[in-house]
């Protein structure tokens, strides 16, 4: 029943949003990327909630969180794509509201995947959450004009690097060392997303605000951000799903 309501709710919501924003120009690469990411987030959300019933109890919460991440992103992309198609402006507020919800949930995923198979201190979650909030707060301040662009960029990078340190060298490394091979593999893959996939975001910030002239930054910024969200949110969830299926089959 829950899955049916999810699908029906999405089907009801889509027509009204699809009608908004006018027609999509074939030459509007950024607009096309908004539509592709919107569709991808919806498909991933349905997939994660359907697959939740196929894994053992200790992995259900992880798949639920994966579905929440893509579901929240789907909802915000419905609005963001409309802002872009109607105005050509960057939907900064919508995007950061989305990130303020989904990035901490990705932090939760790291904690959950470790807690499912080994002992992990709650302090790891608190440290990762603090790093993510510094990263997001500084990024928003720079993009919204509340702080100088370059200092905000540096502070945001510091928050991101702190998270990487904790996962690679700190409590994350200590916790995963006692986990199963499947969890180790998933953890390393998730780390690659944090290191390589999340690097797309500062690249977009730099392309939008630190390089290029007035009037060109919006296209650079949104195309890169859309690509990053597509890869980081959906692939992140698929890694969780993969390890959940493997661990459940071995149980």
Swiss-Prot record:
It is a multi-pass membrane protein. The record marks 98 as: Primary proton acceptor. The record marks 106 as: Responsible for spectral tuning. Residues 1-18 form the signal peptide. GO terms for molecular function: light-activated monoatomic ion channel activity; photoreceptor activity. InterPro entries: Arc/bac/fun_rhodopsins, Proteorhodopsin, Rhodopsin_retinal_BS. It is found in: Cell membrane. The chain crosses the membrane at residues 30-50, 65-85, 97-117, 120-140, 144-164, 190-210, 223-243. Light-driven proton pump. May have a regulatory rather than energy harvesting function, based on light-induced opening of proton channels, to modulate cell physiology depending on light intensity variations. Could be, therefore, a sensory rhodopsin, potentially associated with a transducer component. It comes from Gamma-proteobacterium Hot 75m4. The modification N6-(retinylidene)lysine is found at residue 233. Belongs to the archaeal/bacterial/fungal opsin family. Keywords: Cell membrane, Chromophore, Hydrogen ion transport, Ion transport, Membrane, Photoreceptor protein, Receptor, Retinal protein, Sensory transduction, Signal, Transmembrane, Transmembrane helix, Transport. One of its GO terms (cellular component) is plasma membrane. This is Blue-light absorbing proteorhodopsin. GO terms for biological process: phototransduction; proton transmembrane transport. The keyword Lipid metabolism does not apply. Contains one covalently linked retinal chromophore. The record marks 109 as: Primary proton donor. Pfam families: Bac_rhodopsin (PF01036).
């Amino acid at each position: 029943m829950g899955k049916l309501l999810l699908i029906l709710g999405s089907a009801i919501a889509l027509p009204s949003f699809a009608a908004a924003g006018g027609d999509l120009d074939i030459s509007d690469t950024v607009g096309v990327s908004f539509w592709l990411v919107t569709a991808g987030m919806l498909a991933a959300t349905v997939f994660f909630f359907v697959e939740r019933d196929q894994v053992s109890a200790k992995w259900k919460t992880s798949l639920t969180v994966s579905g929440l991440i893509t579901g929240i992103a789907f909802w915000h992309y419905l609005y963001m794509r409309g802002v872009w198609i109607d105005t050509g402006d960057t939907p900064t507020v919508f995007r950061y509201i989305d990130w303020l919800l989904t990035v901490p949930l990705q932090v939760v995923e790291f904690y959950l995947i470790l807690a499912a198979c080994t002992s992990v201190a709650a302090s790891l979650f608190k440290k990762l959450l603090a790093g993510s909030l510094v990263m997001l707060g500084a990024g928003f301040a720079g993009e919204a004009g509340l702080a100088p662009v370059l200092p905000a960029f540096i502070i945001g990078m510091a928050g991101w690097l702190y998270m990487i340190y904790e996962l690679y060298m700190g409590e994350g490394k200590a916790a995963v060392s006692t986990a199963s091979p499947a969890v180790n593999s998933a953890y390393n893959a998730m780390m690659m997303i944090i290191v390589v996939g999340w690097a797309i975001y500062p690249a977009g910030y730099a392309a939008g605000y630190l390089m290029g002239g007035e009037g060109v930054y919006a296209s650079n910024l949104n195309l890169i951000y859309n690509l990053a969200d597509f890869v980081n949110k959906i692939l992140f969830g698929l890694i969780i799903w993969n390890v959940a299926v493997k661990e459940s089959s071995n149980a």
